[in-house]
Swiss-Prot record:
Gene3D superfamilies: Formyl transferase, C-terminal domain, Formyl transferase, N-terminal domain
PROSITE patterns registered for this protein in UniProt: GART
Protein name: Methionyl-tRNA formyltransferase
Keywords: Protein biosynthesis, Transferase
HAMAP family, A to Z: Formyl_trans
UniProt function note: Attaches a formyl group to the free amino group of methionyl-tRNA(fMet). The formyl group appears to play a dual role in the initiator identity of N-formylmethionyl-tRNA by promoting its recognition by IF2 and preventing the misappropriation of this tRNA by the elongation apparatus.
Organism of derivation: Staphylococcus epidermidis (strain ATCC 12228 / FDA PCI 1200)
The EC number(s) this enzyme carries: 2.1.2.9
Gene: fmt
Family the entry assigns: Belongs to the Fmt family.
GO molecular function terms noted in the UniProt entry: methionyl-tRNA formyltransferase activity
One Pfam family per UniProt: Formyl_trans_C
Enzyme class: transferase
Length: 310
């Protein structure tokens, strides 16, 4: 049975780790440090740590892996393979070269498209109709190693980051399970990536979350679902932030971009930079919980038609 070091952090990684524990010998898990979460700043372990602790697997949590004491400990382990999935740090070259079979990564895009830390978000924001999982050998350059296997999956119009995250997490574990035997036996035919076709999906910044109402209705719809349920697209109304969780396109309604042109029992309908509008169905006003627009409108006394979102 192969001795594997697993490196990952968020929920996306847990299905992959659970599969490895069931099928192989995971001798160590490396994840990010515990972080303060919520308004009360409660120190919270990463999801991967909870899985590892449940199975009594040693856990390493370096703030920075390079030149750390944890790195020295990992280098001393006689591992056959390193598997990473959304770890969140680049691996030092010494660690990449340490295992007998090298290091592989489970990446949530069809490489060479969407290298980087936010491939699921960016694929949806860009209006892609499919994405997938790539399993590749790791090299020093970010997400640029030889491709071992890939599997695509359709992005439906109603999908958002949350639904695609879950689908890709399961797909990643499934594809890795199928691919590992050829990696362990060293019988796979990996192929180089074409760097000329590479695109990048950098981590989402705060300024990326704001909606530009001058964009087309389709682009705004993709923007909202490409950031839902995290980190969440937002706009401002009455100089207060308004988070936008779900919406749909209303054909053939137009007006000045960002203007509320109609309200119904269930929606706020906003003009965009195209001939179609956006109907908001789930929002979170500043200082309040996430709610259906129906519930929001039941507490609003004034007419919102004509108000402008910025």
């Amino acid at each position: 049975m192969s001795k594997i070091i697993f490196m990952g952090t968020p929920d996306f990684s847990t299905k992959i780790l659970e599969m490895l524990i069931a099928e192989h010998e995971v001798i160590a898990v490396v994840t990010q440090p515990d972080r303060p979460v919520g308004r009360k700043k409660v120190m919270t372990p990463p999801p991967v740590k909870r899985v590892a602790t449940k199975h009594q697997i040693p856990v390493y949590q370096p703030e920075k892996l390079k030149d750390s004491q944890e790195l020295e400990s990992l280098l001393s382990l006689e591992s056959d393979l390193i598997v990473t999935a959304a770890f969140g740090q680049l691996l030092p070259e010494s660690l990449l070269n340490a295992p007998k079979l090298g290091a592989i990564n489970v990446h949530a895009s069809l490489l060479p498209k969407y290298r980087g830390g936010a491939p699921i978000h960016q694929a949806i924001i860009d209006g892609e109709e499919e994405t997938g999982i790539t399993i590749m050998y790791m090299v020093k350059k970010l997400d640029a190693g030889n491709i071992i296997s890939q599997q695509s999956i359709r992005i439906e119009e109603e999908d958002n980051v949350g639904t695609m995250h879950d689908k890709l997490s399961f797909l990643g574990a499934e594809l890795l399970k199928k691919t590992l035997p050829s990696i362990i036996d060293n019988t796979n035919d990996s192929i180089p990536q074409d760097d000329a076709l590479a695109t990048f999906a950098s981590n989402i910044r705060r300024e990326d979350e704001r909606v530009d109402w001058n964009m087309s209705a389709q682009a705004i719809h993709n923007h909202i679902r490409g950031l839902s349920p995290w980190p969440v697209a937002y706009t401002t109304m009455n100089e207060k932030n308004l988070k936008l969780f779900s919406a749909f396109i209303v054909k053939g309604k137009k007006g000045n971009p960002g203007t509320i042109i109609e309200t119904t029992k269930h929606e706020l309908i906003i003009a965009t930079g195209s001939d179609d509008a956006i109907a908001l169905t789930e929002i979170q006003p500043a200082g309040k919980k996430r709610m259906k627009v129906t519930d929001y409108l039941s507490g609003v006394q004034e007419s919102l038609v004509g108000k402008v979102l910025l």
